[in-house]
Structures are given as C-alpha cells and as structure tokens.
Amino acid sequence: MTLRVLVVTAVAAEAEAVADGLTGCATRSARRLPSGHTVTSHVLTAGPATRAPATRPTAQAPTAAQALTGRAPAVPAPTAAQAAGPGAGDDPSADAPATADPTATGDATVTAPVTAGGPATVALEATATVDVLAGGVGPAAAAVATATALARAPYPYDLVVSAGIGGGFAPHAPLGALVVADAVVAADLGADTPDGYLTVEKLGFGRSVHTPPPALTARVADALRATGGPCLTAPVLTVSTVTGTAARAAGLAARHPRAGAEAMEGFGVAEAAAAYGVPVVEIRAVSNTVGPRDRAAWRIGAALDALRGAFGSLSSTVFREE
C-alpha cells in the first residue's frame, strides 16, 4: 500500500530543497489548486513489482503510517468483482473509477531508457507518494494552503509534514541542526496582561499546542540522526512575528524552556491536518539563532542543505517502511 505524504513549506526555496532530497523518484507531476498554489507530486519506487492475482481481501499488515502512529490496520471490503466470484475480476479496470489516480493502485509505470531492442516499459512498485507544497509565510497562509491541499487531493493523505528553515534556541539547537517537533506550539496566540502572558487555553478560547504522535516523532528523529548532523526532539514554536530582540527571546525561552526552534507555519499546518484527522510532524533546519536580528550571521544555504539531507533520509527509510 502506498504511503501518501503532504509536505508543506513556506517558500519555494524550501520546497525545492525537500523535492531535491527525495530519493528513488520515478515520476513527478504538478497540479494547480483553486487557491493558486501548486502541488508537485513525487512517486517513490522500490523496484519491479509483481502483481498478485485478485483474491478476497483479508486483514492487512500495518502500513507505515499505521505503524508509526499506532493506527490499527483495517479489513477492506471486497470489490464488486471479487464479490461476484472467480472470473469477474479478470479485468483490472472493472472496479476502478474513470478518474482514478494512477498511484492509487500502488504502481507507477515509467519508460526505461532506449536500448538496441527499443524502449521498454517496466512496472515499479510505488512505496510512497510525496506531495510538496509551498503554502506561504505565516500560520494563516499555511493553514489555508494545507486545508485546500487536503480537501482537493485525489487521494487521502497518511501524513502531513510541516518543513522548512527556522531560528534555533541556543544552546540547544546550533546552526545547521535539525529539530523534530514533539510539540507544535502557537507561542504568541494568547494575551499579554500586567501579570504576564496568558495562553488561549487559560483564556478559554481553544488550544495553542498540537502534539504529534510520539512514535512518529521518534521514528523521524531516528532517521534524521542517521544523517550524521545534530538533531534534537523539542517543541517548535510558531510565531507571527520573527523574534529580533534579546528581550523577546528571553521571554519565549522562559515560557518554553525546552523550545528547540522558532518558525512561522507549523501551528497553521497542524490545525488544518487535525481538522482532516491526519497526523502531523514538524521538521526545522536551523538557519539562525533566536535573538537579536543579525542577517549577516544567518546560514540559510547550510540550513537548506540540512533540510535536503533530512528528506533524503526520510525518503529512504520512514517513507518506505512496511
């Protein structure tokens, strides 16, 4: 069964780093959303597939998403052809809707290089479809883009990933480090009072924290640590205004002493994913230190390289697990 992942970044440079990092990509395509965003779809393959004869479905082994998030595998209902008995399912297109997505069968067809004997076509088993979307800067733009992608997708997603670069909290997250969120926190969604900051929970207006499935967070972090660079699991703060002073950095660190990184989109992505019942994880590559704004000290190129490496690791491990 193909794992389907939606990766949401803020800007095109981040989306390109994610796409460039994906390994084993057999086909790429693009589709336009009504919101004006473009989703690029990458089908990752493992090798030549052998299609088994149709049989009545039985309990399936857990998919990667189920294994990582603790979801129980389901017993699929038989198709009309399977219910009709032997011979009825000989035509593989009999039960497929006319507009079915090519990746829905779990197979992708690619054309092999031309040889002396002419071009050959080989069927490759699709292990994952990774859709990448640059949704815009800030939690509102990210939420709109993610919700639109989820609503208009030709297939249901198993996982949503908020990914990009961000600021790191010293000394936990040095430049170039990867941070995997064990909590996605809307750090400025609340109210300032003479007695201090109040979260929306304390105000009675909703939530400011999303907690990714712990098993998923741990598996992603393990895969990223295999890249050899620094990687930590910690809360990632979502803010609408990037921190640019020592005083604000100190205030955030005091309220969130375990914080690893600051970015602007994670909570918006998580809100949209939660509305559709899809698990979410956030990954940030550190480009600068949270604190006084000093563009000369930023290392955006190195952070994008780390992001590229992160998705190289994920596309060869977590996205391919059975």
For the regions a language model picked out, list residue spans one by one.
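Threonine-centered tandem repeat motifs in low-complexity domains
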Residues: 40, 45, 49-59, 63-64, ...
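Active-site rim beta-loop-alpha module in soluble metabolic enzymes
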Residues: 196-257, 268, 276
